[in-house]
Amino acid sequence: LRCLVGSEMCIRDRVVLDLSNPEVQDFIFGIVDNLMTTYPEIDYIKWDANMSILNHGSQYLPSDQQSHMYIEYHEGFKKVCERIRAKYPDLTLQACASGGGRANYGVMPYFDEFWVSDNTDALQRIYMQWGTSYFFPAIAMASHISAAPNHQTFRVIPLKYRIDVAMSGRLGMEIQPKNM
């Protein structure tokens, strides 16, 4: 996406691709398709979208459609997801973006789970998952057992409690089993 007037904003040398553009949709699908063809043993992809849309304009959309940019972006994202899901139905996909920023009902048919937050501290996580469960089913929330001490809070929480909290969503691990 690009600013139509003024200078573009770039964070950590990243920009958001214009998914309203079918050529960009083909490009992104092609990357995933090439990856899956080259490495067919891949069975899990985390789709990380931790970049806010800062450049509010599309070079693809005509000027009278710029107010529809967010809608067209989302529709283009769904088209890419539909193609990936159709070609790779057994591939597990996780949507991840800044604490659930990609968690929306429009993309739930294409993703098996979404990442609620990078904060994996079980004591804090239980409140996040409880709140999220008001809107989304528990099975959609990726919930992982993490190491102790926690890498964000440095809190040491008993393994059983961390497992219990992680089991209230879609269970995963951010820890080597041998280190449990």
Which positions does each model-derived feature cover?
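Short acidic, glycine/serine/threonine-rich loops at helix termini
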Residues: S7, H56-Y60, N104-P109
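The substrate-binding groove and active-site-proximal loops of carbohydrate-active enzymes
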Residues: R12-F29, P62-G76, N150
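Single conserved hydrophobic/aromatic residue that forms the stacking wall/gate
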Residues: L1-G6, C10-I11
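Short, solvent-exposed turn/loop segments enriched in Gly/Ser/Thr/Pro and often Arg
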Residues: W47-L54, A97-R102
